[in-house]
């Protein structure tokens, strides 16, 4: 009998190892993530990358070699690989982190490369972006520099739902640079409430949004009890 816990643990470990291998092997292709699913014909592997042509290779040689590696070293049965580009690469933190790392390895100044990254992210419609570059960036002593624009959530539900975070490593002559990219996706926050006018009162069908700052909870049971007391007092007066 197959141990269910061991089975799912092994599947999860394989998925993580494949993801780490692809991130290390194809970071210059702006690797964004992968999905692995079992099919009757074998294993379907979907790879997301900002530059799919690098993973596919000339005449498909690179992707064929990758299929052999996944089958031999990761025990994926008959892997069928599909490489596609994310819907909006500029809103994917992993893509932008690897893109920034490659830019630094090409010799661009870290501050210029970071500003270019933030500008591309914000032009794509993000609510906020933050880039942290650490290492021997200005002297022999390691330090870090943080650049930020817009809204970047640090705690709460918005951090889990709206924020995408990724790290990458750039290897230079001065040493290793650590890169961290944080993106606040253009999603609707929970403190925004849309007010729509009814057909009878609206003039142009306009709608607006308000931001809730203070919320006061009203106990309706107290109002009901108060109405009952007032109603009882009025009945007593009428009877008298």
UniProtKB/Swiss-Prot annotation:
It comes from Metallosphaera sedula (strain ATCC 51363 / DSM 5348 / JCM 9185 / NBRC 15509 / TH2). Part of the 30S ribosomal subunit. This is Small ribosomal subunit protein uS3. PANTHER family: 30S/40S RIBOSOMAL PROTEIN S3, SMALL RIBOSOMAL SUBUNIT PROTEIN US3. GO terms for molecular function: rRNA binding; structural constituent of ribosome. Keywords: Ribonucleoprotein, Ribosomal protein, RNA-binding, rRNA-binding. Residues 18-97 form the KH type-2 domain. NCBIfam families: PRK04191.1, uS3_euk_arch. The lineage of its organism: Archaea, Thermoproteota, Thermoprotei, Sulfolobales, Sulfolobaceae. Pfam families: KH_2, Ribosomal_S3_C. Belongs to the universal ribosomal protein uS3 family. Binds the lower part of the 30S subunit head.
């Amino acid at each position: 009998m197959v141990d269910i816990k061991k089975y799912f643990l092994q599947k999860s470990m394989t998925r993580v190892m494949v993801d780490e291998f692809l991130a290390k092997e194809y970071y210059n292709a702006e690797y964004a993530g992968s999905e692995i699913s079992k099919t009757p014909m074998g294993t379907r592997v979907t790879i997301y990358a900002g530059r799919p042509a690098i993973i596919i290779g000339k005449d498909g040689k690179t992707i064929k070699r990758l299929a052999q590696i996944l089958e031999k070293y990761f025990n994926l049965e008959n892997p069928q690989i599909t490489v596609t580009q994310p819907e909006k690469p500029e809103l994917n933190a992993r893509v932008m982190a690897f893109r920034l790392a490659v830019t630094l390895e090409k010799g661009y100044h870290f501050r210029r490369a970071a500003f270019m990254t933030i500008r591309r992210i914000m032009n794509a419609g993000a609510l906020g972006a933050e880039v942290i570059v650490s290492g021997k960036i200005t002297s022999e002593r390691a330090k870090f520099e943080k650049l930020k624009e817009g809204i970047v959530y640090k705690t709460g539900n918005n951090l889990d739902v709206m924020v995408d975070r990724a790290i990458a490593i750039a290897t230079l002559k001065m040493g290793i640079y650590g890169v961290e990219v944080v993106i606040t996706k253009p999603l609707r926050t929970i403190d925004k409430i849309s007010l729509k006018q009814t057909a009878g009162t609206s003039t142009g069908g306009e709608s607006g949004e308000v931001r809730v700052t203070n919320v006061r909870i009203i106990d309706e049971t107290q109002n009901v009890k108060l109405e009952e007391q007032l109603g009882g007092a009025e009945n007593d007066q009428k009877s008298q």
